[in-house]
């Protein structure tokens, strides 16, 4: 296992592996159109990066793709009723559907979260980073929505269920951020220090964003 050097130690260089949008279910095709890359493809990308012996890795958001558009399950093929029916039935059978009237951590909703996270995070990463420290930071899709702004739907700022679903998923599957403003393990903000060679802040800029007037913000003090 690899650990970090003392924050005040002299370090000549640091190598960082960084990537984004690794989430999504197992890749599939419909009518020749590809939806997501196969897990094996993504794992080959990981292997290529790890072969360069990085000192640590940062996974920048979109650890999952499960956009609900305010509903209980993804509205796949919403413009085609037949596709929506068949894919919706398949998703409900394999993964289950959320009950938004309950907390995201309820027994029913937690089962759905685990079905999603086991495929898109646990099965993807496995133990590949066991010897390389890795940090997760969330983005819009980790709140179970794309950052859409349409006439009939504006997905952000995230609603209470989306925030709760993110928190539950992060607590189940994310490695914690340990160097935080209040010294408590966090999921949305943290500092990375690698000796005296590197110091950087990583923060969630999606989940707590607000819109309008001079008080609009991206990063909440509550993080």
Give, region by region, the residue ranges found by the protein language model.
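Metal-dependent phosphoester/phosphodiester hydrolase catalytic core
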Residues: 1-223
